[in-house]
């Protein structure tokens, strides 16, 4: 498994939390998102993230790693999906 997957998993967890708290604005702007990640202490190989390192760790993921991470992300929103379904199917 790719060594970057844990860092990307942490990044996805942060994105998930921001989305759940309606702060998509932070996630949608890459520079702001990277600044936010740095502020909360997310690092790659002991260094703060920047545009290049962010792009690099994501691009080095295998297709299998990406699928695993997407499945984990969607699983985290399962409760939200059920909630929305409950209120939209009245």
Curated annotation (Swiss-Prot):
Gene3D superfamilies for the chain: Anti-Sigma Factor A
Ubl conjugation in keyword set: no
InterPro entries (UniProt xref): AsiA (IPR015100), AsiA_sf (IPR036486)
Example of a GO biological process term: regulation of DNA-templated transcription
SUPFAM superfamilies listed in its UniProt record: Anti-sigma factor AsiA
Keyword terms: Transcription, Transcription regulation
Subunit organization: Interacts with the host sigma factor RpoD, and thereby inhibits its interaction with the catalytic core of the host RNA polymerase.
Function according to Swiss-Prot or TrEMBL: Transcriptional inhibitor. Inhibits sigma 70-directed transcription by weakening its interaction with the core of the host's RNA polymerase. This allows Gp55 to successfully compete for the core enzyme. Plays an important role during the prereplicative period of phage T4 development.
Protein name as catalogued: 10 kDa anti-sigma factor
């Amino acid at each position: 498994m790719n060594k970057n997957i844990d860092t990307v998993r942490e990044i996805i967890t942060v994105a998930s939390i921001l989305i759940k708290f309606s702060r998509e604005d932070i996630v949608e702007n890459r520079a702001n998102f990277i600044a936010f990640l740095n502020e909360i202490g997310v690092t790659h190989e002991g260094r703060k993230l920047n545009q290049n390192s962010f792009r690099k760790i994501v691009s080095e993921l295998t297709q299998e790693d990406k699928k695993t991470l997407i499945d984990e992300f969607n699983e985290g929103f399962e409760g939200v999906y059920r909630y929305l379904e409950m209120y939209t199917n009245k």
